[in-house]
């Protein structure tokens, strides 16, 4: 059986959401958001950086959420969540799988600057720069979603899961209402049962560990 190491509403939510969409049996190892656990010798033997996600399939281990998405979609092609080699949308699909991490990098940097770095070490310049970069990354999606419900013309895919998680995070950091097509898209994604099943029990759409902050001005 597949096994997923996961921390609530971190990037590993992409992998959990995808597994829930696939509706296949798997074991969830719910890790605390605690460096003493994540950097323990036991977990470093699973993931060399002590991060999530990590997918275990028998003797095979895989980390990086984009790689896990490609692996699962190729292993379970009947799901139609991937776009395999012969599919004309294959490279668009790959583009958005990887673009989701472009978005997440800026969001993660902004989270560090606003909440996790000691106040004396924070940089208002870096925070503003990363906020603008995140806004630009989201803005790219706005025209894409004018005439479609999902990123690909053919419909929902794992690419929407990758980008959807990044938007779920961005929603706590910037004003998504400025991008109405994107805001409606995120609402559609959040309405999916597999998305809701990937949230911590009792959670709302807000990321449970991330305080609400003032949007970038």
Language-model features, listed with the residues they occupy:
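Conserved beta-strand edge residues that scaffold enzyme active sites
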Residues: 33-34, 159, 203
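Short, flexible loop/turn segments with low-complexity composition
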Residues: 84-85, 197-205
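GST-like fold's C-terminal all-alpha helical module
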Residues: 100-191
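Active-site-flanking alpha-helical
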Residues: 73, 166-167, 199
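GST-like domain detector, emphasizing the conserved glutathione-binding G-site
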Residues: 1-125
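Residue-level signal for nonpolar/aromatic packing positions in well-ordered secondary structure
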Residues: 19, 55, 68, 141, ...
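Acidic/histidine-enriched, glycine/proline-rich intrinsically disordered or flexible terminal extensions
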Residues: 202-217
């Amino acid at each position: 059986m597949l096994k997923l190491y996961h921390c609530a509403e971190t990037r590993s939510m992409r992998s959990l959401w995808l597994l829930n969409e696939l509706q296949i049996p798997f074991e969830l190892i719910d890790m605390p958001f605690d460096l003493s656990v994540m950097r323990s010798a036991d977990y470093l033997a699973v993931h060399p950086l002590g991060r999530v996600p990590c997918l275990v399939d028998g003797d095979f281990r895989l980390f990086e959420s984009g790689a896990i998405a490609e692996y699962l979609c190729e292993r379970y092609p009947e799901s139609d969540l991937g776009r395999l080699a012969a599919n004309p949308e294959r490279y668009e699909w790959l583009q958005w799988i990887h673009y989701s991490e472009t978005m997440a990098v800026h969001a993660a940097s902004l989270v560090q600057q606003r909440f996790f770095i000691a106040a004396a070490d924070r940089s208002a310049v870096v925070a503003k720069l990363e906020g603008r970069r995140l806004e630009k990354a989201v803005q790219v999606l706005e025209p894409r979603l004018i005439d479609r419900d999902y990123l690909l013309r053919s419909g929902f895919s794992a690419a929407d899961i990758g980008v959807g998680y990044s938007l779920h995070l961005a929603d706590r950091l910037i004003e998504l209402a400025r991008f109405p097509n994107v805001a409606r898209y995120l609402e559609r994604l959040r309405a999916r049962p597999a998305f809701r099943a990937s949230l911590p029990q009792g959670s709302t759409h807000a990321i449970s560990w991330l305080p609400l902050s003032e949007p970038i001005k």
